[in-house]
Amino acid sequence: MWFPEPVGFAATDLAALVTGETGADLHVVLAPQAEWHDSEAQTDADKRLAELRSRYDGPTRSVDDPELADVAELLSQPPHACYGWFSDGSQHLSALAAGSSWFGLIAIRDGDEIWVRTFRPQRLSTVLADVLPHDHVRSNAQPVTVLRSELLEARKTGLARNSAVRQAERIIADPPLVSAELYGEQRDRNGRHRCEFPLRVYDTATGRWALQISKHYDEERWDLSAATTARVADLLDGLHSRQDA
């Protein structure tokens, strides 16, 4: 079951295929809303599922290619993954980049369809970051670090405590053309481990900005920095590092 080019599936059909193979749900970033079918609709769904099984649940073309069970595992309970939601205000996508020791996949949900592509081992963070638009304004602005309480105080009083808060306010006030919320995830015998705070990415008229949130005593620290796609991938890898710590 090898997809060097994206192959499309109805989200509900892929969810049924994965659950039937693994006993687990499709990954949360891809999973469609549960539906109840009458007997006729259920018969049609069962027929589509049987057709998918007939097409994909058989001998692989090469001993190096994954079987249906291998692909289904990465689509439901991957050992390593990063994923997220993307929006430009009109189009909303969600994506999962997942990998094992010998292959990986990228699955992108667009409405009721999910497109799946497989690949030999690659850096998952790079694969997911590549979902972001390639065409974006580049900024040379210096990174800025503030506390969430400082921003709330400035919003309440109209007075910024320092230049860092003023710069952060300017960045945050710029309407996003594209926004993304990205997570890192690992799974082991003790279950699924997701980063506590997502990496947020905003494409604006003044540049692409990455927002990292972390704990600072009983506060939230906000790190805002100009970012390229490569930088977003590096920051995603950092989410994994914090899970391992």
Predicted regions span which residues?
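Short, surface-exposed polybasic-aromatic patches that bind anionic ligands, especially phosphate groups
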Residues: 1-245
